[in-house]
Each structure stands twice: as structure tokens, then as C-alpha cells.
Amino acid sequence: MEKGETKIKLGYEILWKFIIRPPRDDYPLNYLGPSQFKYNSKAYIRRDFILISHQGYKMPSSLIEPLSRPCKKMPVVIYLHGNASSRLEGLNTLSTLLPHNINLFIVDLPGCGHSEGDYISLGYYESYDVGIIVDFLENLPGTGNIGIWGRSMGASTGLIYAHRDKRIKALCLDSPFANFCRLARELTKQYINLPDFIINGILKIIGGTIKEKNGIDIFRLNPIEEAENAFQPAIFVHAINDKLINLHHAIDIFNIYGGEKSLKCSEIGGHNSKRPKRITQEIGNFFEKYLQNNNNEFDINEDNKLNEYKINYVNDLNQSFVFKSGEYYKNRELYNSLKEENEKKNMDDIKKILLNINENDISKESTELNSNISINEKK
């Protein structure tokens, strides 16, 4: 094999991995924080579980709830993270949900964090995993109404799933993409202005490789087609300056969304930025409005305590770093800065690859890919 051909093959490998095998957020487990802690003088516990995904992969997950329940049934929000992220991301929502007496469920989706699985599917397989999570929560004593809060891939996953299940009562969709093929074209043109025929050829080859490895036609992933059938109240969130998923994706979904809806745009930050306090407050009020109702009867007594757990909670809030203003984010900012450096390097590599691809490269690669697919189909 010639040096040029090896370079092109390496280039395509980087491109398809960027979509279904982004850098894994292999976080230190102590970043989950203490399993018992206090927030606003109230004791909480984190209970860890292993769920089995639709494809048979282990998914580490956690439920965060108060030690002494204010009611027999408490609402819970399932947080669905982004594509190169993990359940760690969901901890950012605790200060939004806990003051409203809403529990939080976080999970490492397959191919992410400490879960099993080699690839992600940007919402296709993950949407089936949401059903497994909902079934699990329904079978836990004390589960009230269930909501979904998803970001990026997680937002599109939530949109794909929600209309299938009446048990989901409310949605927060932060930075969803409407159609993956459109998103891929936009990202390609953003980094380098290639002719349409080259972009089409690149996407065709990458799509074929992804289908061979993951079994899905990634460029037919179209979350927006589920929006019209959705019926749950939803709050959409998007950064105006999001360079990864343009604001028009959220606007397009919002315009045809079938349920009660509102759109909150952030003028601060971009795709992965922390949302302004005014928006997180609105999200908290939104979930309280739609998840706290007569199904969650308030009944404060000893029977509502999780007596089977011996709690040695953190008395000094500084030790809990999840809630201490700045402490948690100091750890995460350092961690995120390293991730952002890697992501920038990946995008720079991709840009160089795209600049060196020509029509002959696409033709050769497409012929070889079709040949491999035919051989596999015969097997």
C-alpha cells in the first residue's frame, strides 16, 4: 500500500470515529463526589446501579435522592448526556432540581464513560436504552412522575424516545440536532469549503463504514420527524453562538413540536458552556410545574426514610465539591480544558484530511468499501 493511500485511510478512520467513537470520558470515579452529602442542610444519598442496555451492555448509573423523603412518591428527572460525555455531566443539574424536591437519575450511555460498548449511535440505540431506564425507575418504590433532561446527543435521544412513552411527563431539550446529515454537512463546510460532490462522497463512504461497524444508517437519523408527534410539555435551550449545533436546529424542531413548548436562548457561551442562572431557574420551575402534582402526595414521616442505608453524610459543604460554588467547576474546568484541547486537535486533523481529499480518493475508497460490505453480506 502506498504512503498516500495509507494517509487517506487513516483520514477516513479519524472521520468515522469522530462520529461514533469520540474520545471516551473515562472520568475518575471520585469525580462523582461523596455518596452521602448535605445540600441546604438536607441529607442526600447517591445509590449506584448497573443497568443492561438494549444491546446487552452494562450501563453504570446513579439515583440521587433525599435521605428523608418529603413525600411517598417523588418525581425524578433522567439526565441524558452528550456524545463525548458521561453521567458526570448530569451532576451540574443537582442545584437546579434538588430545591424543587426532584430526584436525579444519571447514566453512562453505551460507549461512554464507564459503560460497555465500543460505539455510540447519536440517539438511535440510546433511545431504546431510555425505555429500559424508565422501566427500572417505575419498578423502584417511591418513583413519581418522570421527566427527561437531555443535552446535545442526549437531547435528540430524548426527543426520539418521548413520544413513544406516556410515562414521560416533561422534557428539557438542550442543544438538540434536527437531522444528522444536515449537521454533518454544516460541520464539514464550517471547517473547509469543499465542493458538494466531494462532501457527498465523503459522507457516503463514512456512512457505509458506520453501517458496517454499528449496523445503523447514521445519515438517516432524523430526530425532527418525531417532534410533531410529541405531546409532553418541553422547554428548549440553545446557545446563540453554538458553533457545533447551530441554533436553527432547535428553532426548526421547536416550530413543529406537538406539545406545549418554550424556547430559551443563551447569549453566553457555546455548545458545552454552563447555562446562565436565569435559564437553569426556569428549567427548575418548569420541572416543578409539570412533575410535582397530586401523584406525589406529601406525607412527612419516619416511614419515608431510607432506613436501610447508614448515612455518614458530609457536614462540611466544602468537602462535597459538587455544590460548593467554584470547587466542583475547578476540577471540571481543568478536566474539560484537556478534553477541549483533544477535541480541537481532532478537528485540526480532520481539516487537514479534508484539504487533501480529492475525487480519485473518494472513488477508490468507495469501491473498496462496497466490496467489503458485499463480502460481509455473503458471510
Question: What are these regions, as identified by a protein language model?
Answer:
Residues I160-I216, E225:
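Hydrolase active-site cap/lid region
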Residues N83-T96:
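The serine-hydrolase catalytic nucleophile loop
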Residues M1-I52, S62, F323-E333, L354:
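An N-terminal hydrophobic leader/cap segment in hydrolases
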Residues L97-E116:
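Conserved alpha/beta-hydrolase
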Residues N229-F231, F236-H238, D242:
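Short beta-strand/loop motif that positions the catalytic acidic residue
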Residues I120-P141:
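Alpha/beta-hydrolase active-site loop
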Residues Q232, N246-F254:
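Short alpha-helix in the alpha/beta-hydrolase fold that links the catalytic acid
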Residues G269-T280:
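Catalytic histidine-centered segment of alpha/beta-hydrolase-like enzymes
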